[in-house]
Structures are given as C-alpha cells and as structure tokens.
Amino acid sequence: MTKRTASIKRQTTETTISLSLNLDGSGQAEMCTGVRLFDHMLSQLAKHGLFDINVSANGDDIHHLVEDVALTLGKAFNEALGERKGIVRMADATVPMDDSLATVALDLSGRGYAVVDLPFSKNDLTGFPTDLVRHFLETFAIEGRLNLHARILYGSNDHHKAEALFKALARALDKATSLDPRREGIAPSTKGMLEN
C-alpha cells in the first residue's frame, strides 16, 4: 500500500509552518503553535481521527497563524489523499461534549466548499477568537479540496461546542479517508476520477 503521508513547510513574511500528516496513523499529535486552545483543538483532530499530525508554527498574529495552519493542513490532506482511489469519500459524524452537540458531514470530492453554522455566545475562547474557528474550517475545506458542512446544534459552553465540533470533524474525516477494499484502485465517482 502506498503511504498516505505529506510533509509541508510554508514560510511567508507573516508565518513559518512545518507540518507532517499520516492519514493511516494512530492519533499521535505534536502541536506547537503558541496558542494553547488551538493546539488543543488540533490535537482533538489527530486523536479522534487517528491521524498522526505534527505542527510547528509561529506567526505575527493569531489570525495569520490559524489561517496558514488551516491552509497547510488542507494542502497536506489533499497531498496525502493523492488520486483518492479506494477511499470511502463521504462521511458524517455527530458528537456530544457534555451540554453541546455538533455535526459534520463531508465529501472528499476534490471540490473545496464549506457551509458553517457556529452559534458561539461570544467571540472569545480563553483568548482564541471564535470567528477563527469558522475561518479555519473554510480555509481547510478549500485547500483540502473537500465539501464540508459543519454545525453546532446546541450547547451552553463555548469550549464544549468547539471541542465537539473538532471531534466530529475528526470522526468524519477518519471515515471518509478510510480505504474500502471493494474500491481498491478505483475512484469513488461515476466520472471515474476525482479532482486533486
């Protein structure tokens, strides 16, 4: 089996990022972005998606940092998926976190698009602006070339809402990136191929 991995380095005048991804990992996470809550959410993605993800990143502000990590992670997923042959392709997950419930449905179609409904009660999660959760998901979907629908259904604690959302994203990505032995070597599309 071909290794489904990617390593990407990105350096701009605003950020420096080094990221590695193994789609067939065991949930190992090493995150160092300097933003503790962001590291925590990225670790949820690795742990509950069973992806090995290492991120080392720094930037001139939190917006540029989150945006460029999302961009780099999306590119890494796209690269690791290759021609996307044999994958399940479409999946969804609904995940509770105490008072909160979030759902994610996605299609690794090769076409980046995001529909995001995130009713946070305020724009702050211990120093992390909640509007950056939306921006992360939209950027990740576009660069990862996946159709993503993400919604927080309800909850009273914004941290729990965000964590349920990242866990749902992880579970849906794990299912969608899984290899189906019945589709070995075949693109899961009536077109016979998926964009990459």
From Swiss-Prot:
GO cellular component, as recorded: cytoplasm
According to its UniProt entry, the protein's GO biological process terms are:
L-histidine biosynthetic process
UniProt keyword annotations, A-Z: Amino-acid biosynthesis, Cytoplasm, Histidine biosynthesis, Lyase
Q: Which InterPro entries match?
A: IGPD_sf, ImidazoleglycerolP_deHydtase, ImidazoleglycerP_deHydtase_CS, Ribosomal_Su5_D2-typ_SF
Tell me the Pfam families matching this sequence: IGPD (PF00475)
The family database entries (PROSITE patterns) matched by this protein are listed as: IGP_DEHYDRATASE_2
Q: Where found in the cell?
A: Cytoplasm
Quote the EC number: 4.2.1.19
What does the record give as the reaction this protein catalyses? D-erythro-1-(imidazol-4-yl)glycerol 3-phosphate = 3-(imidazol-4-yl)-2-oxopropyl phosphate + H2O
The pathway entry for this protein reads as: Amino-acid biosynthesis; L-histidine biosynthesis; L-histidine from 5-phospho-alpha-D-ribose 1-diphosphate: step 6/9
Molecular-function annotations in GO: imidazoleglycerol-phosphate dehydratase activity
Family from the record = Belongs to the imidazoleglycerol-phosphate dehydratase family.
What protein am I looking at?
Imidazoleglycerol-phosphate dehydratase
Corresponding gene?
hisB
